[in-house]
Amino acid sequence: MASVGSRLTRFYISRPGVIARRFLAHAGMDDMGVSLSRSSLERLEFDNVALKKLPLDPSTEPGVRQVRGSCFSRVQPTPLKNPEFVAVSAPALALLGLDAEEVLKDPLGPEYLSGSKVMPGSEPAAHCYCGHQFGQFAGQLGDGAACYLGEVKAPAGQSPELLRENPTGRWEIQVKGAGLTPYSRQADGRKVLRSSIREFLCSEAVFALGVPTTRAGSVVTSDSRVMRDIFYDGNPRMERCSVVLRIAPSFIRFGSFEIFKRADEFTGRQGPSYGHDELRTQMLEYVIENFYPEIHRNYPDLTERNTAFFKEVTVRTARLVAQWQCVGFCHGVLNTDNMSILGLTLDYGPFGFMDRFDPDFICNASDNSGRYSYQAQPAICRWNLARLAEALEPDLPPDRAEQVLDEYLPLYNDFYLSNMRKKLGLLRKEEPEDEMLITELMQTMHNTGADFTNTFRSLSQISCPTQEEAEDESETIKQATELLLHQSASLEELKAANRPSMDPRELAMLVSMAQSNPALFQMISDRGTVSRQLERLSRLKELMDTTEEQLRVKHTEHWSDWIQKYRQRLARECESGVDVKDVQTERVRVMNNNNPHVVLRNYIAQNAIAAAENGDFSEVQRVLKVLEKPFSVQEGLEQPGWMGRGGAAIPGERDETEEEGSNSSGAGARGLVPYDSKPPVWANEICVTUSS
């Protein structure tokens, strides 16, 4: 044991409204028989710069209200009854210098990490922000269920990479589901077990995939209950209140700057701090100085500085959405209040990883118009950047913003092509035809209903052509085709996928209304929705007249045509006298490091949630461990620890403040399903929704 000598310890004594700080010698206290030992959570060193640099709401009155001229409001988290850990993420907690095992053993750990008990140095607060939700300005939103706890100083010795990602050396921690705030609107500030587990698992899964994201350190549940109408059918039930610990350099978002917005011409709403121009400038200065220090140092001219800042946010956003597209991730609620100013994936609600590839994939069942579909994400992110630019006027001149926005699409395309070349193992050359090869791959996947994750993972098994194979190229293509046919959809799967969600009679009525009474039609529906439903109906009719054998012939033609082009492109990777075996070894390595073996599919999350709702948290913990190594082929993936035999559901949580939930109408009996397989039939019943 280290010598105690004259070493001093900072000792906190909590009293109502007061924290008295005393410096006492270890030896003296030991003589008095008083223990000075504090847990690692109680030793966290806070430096809450955001509350020092940005204005705090002077009002402490309880209840929902408009907060003007302030960025944060002080709050008191509502304690949970008998909180307990569901799971913790060791890598995420390590950012704070915490050891996961020590945190799990701490009897006060669940209380501290749910906000039920306030850690020394923590200053609970809720952040004020606005947002465009589904294209309409919604006015004040804010942290309706989340609570800022403070900013923890990172432990010494963090990697240079981490310091680049987080130059402040502080990690903001917040608890989501900690109770009422001034921004809770009609909700209760609580989250339930379902949505909390989804956010916890997906935060860590996305990080492990190499995609920028906020982190999740823990998920805590409790004996506190809230009422939720799970299926939106008027039959509410009581559910367990749960809390996620979220970690990021900052949770400031595009919508943080929209609190200064003038009255919107369409909705009539305005930001609560409209007219407080000096506050907008102050917030902009805070963000750039703390999170973009190189820009702050290198651009003394304010216009140039603000333009450089907006350019960097644009670059990060373009890179982020390109990474989403390349792993088949759909966010679900890309409102401006869910867009990070740091280019991080923020707010996991009705997200989804694609199973069967569909460019029109909509993971959020509340998104009736498909505004936030998979293929719409790049354009929506540009639209959100344009709203951010408007919010920064006049600190960011409109002409400068437009110049930057013109660069967004080329930036996105470059990031996307770069990532896709790695996924296809095209490493030695960049050819103009690569873009068409990728486009044709996606079209083939769509035509065959191929599984997104497994198809890309399988491509590394298609080798570069060798001299020996040249004599029997047709057999090689046949074998590769069989490989990808295994990941393609069956006739019944395609029928289920293309079944319209609208009754054909309702669809016919809407088509007639669109022609006879366009104004009424616009009030009831939109052309995009009807068009997608008609396309589904048309394809379903075609499938009804197709046999399984005919479908296989079509799929075989699609895949063999593309594989032939792919092999020709791979042959050009091996020109100039290179060793084909060396090229093949390197491309397999790169491909397997860019094409995950396992992602957080909805059925995996559902099994973990159903087990947890039955009191078994082991499946959440097991799934977390698997998702921490998504590119590895791990043992035991074929035998999930919990199989969900009882038909338990993963229904949705009504949440008027932000997002998310997931609804399922009863999954029926379930069998053993590997984590790395195509989803089981019952997974089609999972319905993830959003209520704003």
UniProtKB/Swiss-Prot annotation:
It comes from the Eukaryota. It catalyses: L-tyrosyl-[protein] + ATP = O-(5'-adenylyl)-L-tyrosyl-[protein] + diphosphate; L-threonyl-[protein] + ATP = 3-O-(5'-adenylyl)-L-threonyl-[protein] + diphosphate; L-seryl-[protein] + ATP = 3-O-(5'-adenylyl)-L-seryl-[protein] + diphosphate. ATP binds at G142, G144, K176, D188, G189, R246, R253, D347. GO terms for molecular function: AMPylase activity; ATP binding; metal ion binding. Its main location: mitochondrion. Mg(2+) binds at N338, D347. Residues 1-24 form a transit peptide. Residues 637-676 are annotated as: Disordered. The keyword Metal-binding applies. Its EC number is 2.7.7.108. GO terms for cellular component: mitochondrion. It is found in: Mitochondrion. The active site is at D337. It is an enzyme of class 2 (transferase). Keywords: ATP-binding, Magnesium, Metal-binding, Mitochondrion, Nucleotide-binding, Nucleotidyltransferase, Selenocysteine, Transferase, Transit peptide. Its cofactor is Mg(2+). Catalyzes the transfer of adenosine 5'-monophosphate (AMP) to Ser, Thr and Tyr residues of target proteins (AMPylation). May be a redox-active mitochondrial selenoprotein which interacts with a redox target protein. Belongs to the SELO family. This is Protein adenylyltransferase SelO-1, mitochondrial. The gene is selenoo1.
